[in-house]
A protein has these predicted regions:
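Glycine-rich phosphate/pyrophosphate-binding loop and the adjoining helix
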Residues: 2-10, 140-188
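Helix-loop-strand module that forms the ligand-binding subsite of alpha/beta enzymes
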Residues: 58-138
Length: 188
């Protein structure tokens, strides 16, 4: 956990694509974070597909690192695309790996969710799906504000900068609310 003033957030992006709108949205969140908040990014793209036979032999090193990162963070930020009305396979795989006993590190963590998609819904269904997982794993998802970046191809420039001022304000508000939520539920 971070010091008494700041909140440490572990972020994970459910998209592996180099030019991903979700990766760009995560960069925007890092840029807009409140003073004193730190946001570290977990690398979840190298995990093998979850297999209990593998886990029974011990967590793979990148998964063990991820579990330690989750445990050390005050709060979590999920940034997810929407694939077939759900979160991405890479994000679900990371959650599946990290949630296994012993010492499931998600329990009690405050979490914020945001996402971007080319569709009008802006990842609303994926975020709902992810929220259900969060509740099952005893995380505490932040309810408001919601950040659904729809029609994302019109809101990022060629360099990947998020140009939508309303959306930038929502991301900023989400992070401020996450900081307040983390303090309110006693994680900080």
């Amino acid at each position: 956990m971070s010091d008494a003033k700041g909140i440490s957030v572990l972020a994970m992006c459910g998209s592996l694509r180099a030019g991903s709108y979700n990766r760009a949205a995560l960069r925007t969140a890092i840029e807009l974070k409140p003073p004193g908040m730190t946001i570290d990014t977990a690398d979840i793209g190298s995990f093998p597909l979850y297999n209990e036979d593998v886990r029974a032999q011990g967590f793979p090193p990148p998964v063990e690192t991820f579990r330690r990162q989750i445990a050390a963070a005050d709060a979590l930020l999920f940034v997810t695309p929407e694939y077939n009305y759900s979160m991405s396979g890479v994000l679900k795989n990371a959650i599946d790996w990290a949630s296994r006993p012993p010492d499931q590190p998600f329990a009690g963590k405050p979490v914020a969710i945001m996402g971007a998609s080319a569709g009008m819904g802006g990842t609303a269904r994926a975020q709902y799906d992810l929220r259900r997982c969060c509740v099952f794993l005893d995380m505490h998802p932040l309810n408001k504000p919601e950040v659904f970046i729809g029609v994302a191809h019109t809101k990022f420039d060629a360099e990947g900068s998020f140009t939508d001022e309303v959306g930038r304000g929502l991301i900023r508000d989400l992070l401020v609310a996450l900081e307040q939520w983390t303090r309110q539920i006693g994680r900080k």
